[in-house]
A protein has these predicted regions:
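Active-site-proximal helices and loops of the catalytic beta/alpha 8
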Residues: 141-150, 160, 228-333, 337-340, ...
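Short proline/glycine-enriched turn/loop motifs at strand-loop junctions of beta-rich domains
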Residues: 470-475, 545-551, 620-624, 631-632, ...
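Substrate-binding/active-site clefts of carbohydrate-active enzymes
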Residues: 25-32, 39-237, 253-276, 280-283, ...
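Beta-strand/beta-sandwich contexts
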Residues: 520-551, 592-605
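Structured interaction patches on ligand/partner-binding surfaces of diverse proteins
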Residues: 491-507, 676-708
Length: 708
């Protein structure tokens, strides 16, 4: 489509700012995200291909894979009709901030085309925008997205600046003013530690260097303010959500305060990259503790592994089923997990298995499955490059085709429409209905809305499906995909208890069938709350169906929240002035009919990152860890388990332990340190509770001795 003229774009942006929650809603469960590596998508402005600020990093032949190739924000806007036609409702773009200006190799080109080598978080990369590093092209794209009722997700990399061993040597700027570099850091803006060698070591992950990238010290008050200001600036330019790079490698406690800062600024949605192979990963319990408590959802790496194993490597479907069941039992908000099977960091599925049926089946699974789906750019065009096993950078191919007629494109469009229309997909529960090595039949249900999906990944063999039960009401259902992936109709007869028998049938090879039923809700049904953690005064949105057009109430215990807006499917309110703790929030319609409750954590105040150190702590054995616990929800409300106490703390200088924790601004908190032993026993320190008054801004530090 034509790009919106800049004057019109500015006006549209102003309208978006006034439009409120409809465009800025925290509820992403019904979205379909299209991930774009900006430099590899489309060249909409050739004047920024070889800018004066960073010359010689562009390759017009698209043969030097570590060079810029010309894709930019204007190019994304040029192709917006293509993206929207596919059913995507949000785009996730690679980091847009100003990146390293110098070549990082002595032979060929090594440039930050990917966006992850920031030098200045406060302005836009000239290769993506313009020679003045202005927000003009960015604002135009965001305005165009919002005028199409689509959302903008920006990737933010809070872990690091740029490489510490080449080019600008990690140099960091604040809107053009030099702050520090890896070899010039008098104020301690960076950590100066070796590269991470043990990715299961909590201290190394958070304080060592990730692949030579100069590691930012978020506990430094200047860096804390800088990173939060960078996010705030993007929000002032109407960004709807953030994908947070490498959250596993950033100081975990600080990230709670970062999320809180973002939510204090404006409605948003945050999801982070916590790389792990499966639910057996040693730090898997840390991952769901982080997601449940921080307000930051996660990219679903365990499910990514399972999808790739099943659809590319022909593993048993039970791997997917087991992964989903495990995660659903661990994550408080599993429908907020962000799901994917391809990305900028791994070989594409078609490199692993060049079978378009398998790709299309995986897409259908992703789009009907639990979580918020991401389509990696070009998958709908079957793009891949097998050089070096298709690994980085060969997975970041040039987007050479925009064909709207591929089967994959059509499947995405159909199922994106289903996700928007049927609440079972975005909000529903998950139930396996039939399973063997090659066939997976699963059901999504949200009250009376039902979606049943049957996938056979075997390209040559059909299977007789007997004993299938479903929550679909009696009737005959046609394939929602209309046969795009060899689907068929299904007849359901009457049963009992939400288990209606389906007629026996043979599932075709290489097939996906989708059957669905939906009704208008007669009573209020809550499917989402976002964010799910915040202090009194924060804006929160509940989404679902059947709320009615007349205003009802939202209750935290007996305390009513102030309603900002009310519609049949979405209610925005202000968290009331209640005590900190966990609440089951209750929505009632104007007639007093109550919906199902949904969990929310009320904080005591906005969050400030504080580093606690306890010297000479209780001696520990392998598997024992020191935690902190205290008298506020931010300190675990005196919890004494791995999931409820705060930690584990870190011990690079054993027997001294430390931990960064986000605490309520201005509050005087009481706390103690405990030793949670490998067998579950808890050893408390003696003496009175420690006491600390949290700063009202910046960062804090407190050091005490273990009380024997």
């Amino acid at each position: 489509m034509q790009r919106i003229p800049r004057a019109v774009a500015a006006a549209a942006a102003a309208v978006c700012a006034l439009a409120g929650v409809s465009l800025r809603s925290q509820d992403f469960k019904k979205q379909v995200i299209y991930q774009i590596v900006t430099d590899r998508f489309y060249d909409g402005d050739t004047t920024n291909d070889n800018p004066a600020e960073s010359p010689g990093l562009f390759d017009s032949t698209h043969t030097q894979w570590q060079a810029y190739w010309g894709g930019d924000l204007a190019g994304i806007q040029d192709q917006l009709s293509y993206i929207k036609g596919m059913g995507a409702t949000a785009i996730w773009v690679s980091p847009v901030v100003n990146n390293e200006n110098l070549n990082c190799t002595s032979s060929g080109i090594s440039a930050p085309y990917h966006g992850y080598w920031a030098r200045d978080f406060m302005n836009i990369e000239e290769h993506f925008g313009d020679n003045s590093n202005s927000f003009s092209a960015f604002d135009s794209l965001v305005a165009a997205l919002h005028s199409n009722n689509m959302k903008m997700i920006v990737d933010e990399a809070n872990n690091h600046s740029n490489p510490d061993n080449c080019g600008e040597m990690g140099s960091l700027y604040n809107n053009g003013t030099f702050m520090a570099a890896a070899n010039n850091d008098p104020n301690g803006y960076f950590h100066h530690n070796p590269d991470i060698s043990n990715y299961n070591d909590r201290y190394q992950l958070q304080y060592y260097t990730l692949e030579d990238l100069t590691d930012l010290n978020q506990e430094n008050a200047t860096i804390d303010a800088y990173l939060k200001s960078a996010a705030s600036q993007l929000q002032s330019h109407h960004v709807d959500a953030f994908r947070l790079d490498a959250v596993k490698d950033v100081t975990w406690g600080w990230e709670y305060s970062f999320a809180n800062s973002v939510y204090n600024n404006a409605p948003s949605f945050l999801y982070g990259e916590w790389d792990q192979s499966n639910t057996g990963d040693p730090l898997y319990p840390d991952s769901y503790k982080f997601a449940n408590d921080s307000g930051i959802s996660l990219l679903d790496f365990p499910l990514n592994t399972a999808i790739r194993d099943v659809f590319a490597s022909n593993n048993n479907f039970s791997e997917i089923d087991s992964t989903i069941n495990t995660e659903n039992s661990n994550f408080t908000y599993p429908n907020d997990l962000v799901t994917f099977f391809d990305s900028q960091d791994e070989s594409r599925l078609l490199t692993l298995n060049d079978d378009q049926n398998r790709l299309q089946e995986a897409m259908a699974f992703l789009l009907t499955g639990r979580g918020i789906p991401i389509i990696f750019y070009g998958d709908e065009q079957y793009l891949f490059n097998n050089t070096n096993g298709g690994n980085d950078p060969y997975n970041r191919v040039w987007m050479s085709s925009f064909n709207t007629g591929t089967t994959a494109y059509k499947i995405i469009a159909k199922l994106a429409g289903l996700r928007a229309a049927n609440d079972a997909v975005g909000y529903g529960t998950w139930k396996q209905r039939w399973l063997n090595n090659d066939v997976y039949i699963y059901e999504r249900q949200f009250f009376n809305d039902v979606v049943l999906v049957a996938i056979n990944k075997n390209d040559t063999t059909g299977y007789s499906i007997t004993g299938l039960y479903t929550a679909l009401p009696p009737g005959t259902y046609t394939d929602y995909l209309g046969g795009l992936q060899n689907g068929n109709s299904l007849t359901v007869t009457s049963g009992s208890g939400g288990n209606n028998p389906a007629n026996n049938y043979t599932i075709a090879p290489a097939s996906v069938s989708v059957w669905q039923y939906q009704v208008n809700a007669a009573t209020p049904e809550v499917g989402s709350i976002g964010p799910h953690v915040g202090q009194p005064g924060m804006t929160v949105t509940i989404a679902g169906d059947g709320f009615g057009s007349s205003q009802g109430s939202v209750l935290f215990g007996s305390s009513a929240a102030a309603i900002q807006s009310w519609s049949n499917t979405s209610v925005t309110f202000t968290v009331p002035n209640v005590s900190n703790g966990s609440y089951n929030v209750q929505l009632k319609n104007s007639g007093g009919t109550a919906a199902n409750t949904i969990a929310f954590t009320v904080l005591a105040a906005k969050l400030i990152p504080v580093t606690f150190t306890v010297n000479n702590a209780n001696p520990t054995n392998p598997g024992d860890y020191i935690f902190v616990t205290g008298n506020t929800v931010e300190l675990g409300n005196w919890g004494t388990t791995f999931q409820t106490a705060i930690g584990p703390m870190l011990d690079p200088n054993y027997p001294n332990w430390f931990l960064n924790v986000s605490l309520p601004a201005g509050a005087t908190v009481q706390f103690k340190f405990i030793d949670i032993q490998a067998n579950g026993n808890v050893v408390w320190e003696n003496g009175s509770n420690h006491q600390y008054t949290v700063p009202t801004s910046g960062t804090g530090y407190d050091t005490v001795n273990w009380q024997y």
